[in-house]
From Swiss-Prot:
It is found in: Host membrane; Virion. This is Uncharacterized protein E146L. The keyword Cytoplasm does not apply. The chain crosses the membrane at residues 7-27. The keyword Oxidoreductase does not apply. Keywords: Host membrane, Membrane, Transmembrane, Transmembrane helix, Virion. It is a single-pass membrane protein. One of its GO terms (cellular component) is membrane. Induction: Expressed in the late phase of the viral replicative cycle.
Length: 146
């Protein structure tokens, strides 16, 4: 009975070590930073033409100023990850995607919506939207292919 217990304990220890190694590998290796500023077209592309569905994002923050000069930030990590994962079931998934889709809209204060700040209810008219033309916007974070 002692031999069986020792074997099970050994296997359990090996599995725990492998899980720890996998956790360290995923969280601390292979991430490359990106930064886009106002006016840039935001395009994420895989380096080896693999499917964009395998791209993952971490610590992605969209920061922008409003016409009054107030600074706003929103974590958009889940948004970007879900955009990439959305290509999983495509028959011919692309190797890149552009924020804004086919419009290829440059990064601006409306690239991501923060309710109560830059949503349609708050900025309801074209005249109000024009006030936002000179507002800064940045998108920063980490990306990797899994």
């Amino acid at each position: 009975m002692g031999g069986t217990t020792d074997f099970v304990l050994s296997i359990t220890i090996v599995l725990v070590i492998l899980i720890i190694i996998a956790f360290i590998w995923y969280n601390f290796t292979g991430w490359s930073p990106f930064k886009y500023s106002k006016g840039n077209t935001v395009t994420f592309k895989t380096p080896d033409e693999s499917s964009i569905a395998y791209m993952r994002f971490k610590n992605c923050v969209f920061t922008f100023t409003d016409p009054k000069g107030s600074l706003h930030s929103v974590d958009v990590t889940n948004v970007l990850n879900n955009m990439a994962k959305g290509f999983r079931d495509a028959q011919n998934p692309p190797s890149s995607f552009t924020l804004g889709g086919h419009c290829q809209a440059p990064l601006n204060a409306f690239s991501f919506i923060l309710p109560g700040v830059n949503d349609r209810a708050t900025v309801a008219t074209a005249d109000e939207a024009k006030k936002w033309e000179n507002c800064d916007a940045t998108l920063t974070g980490l990306q990797r292919i899994i």
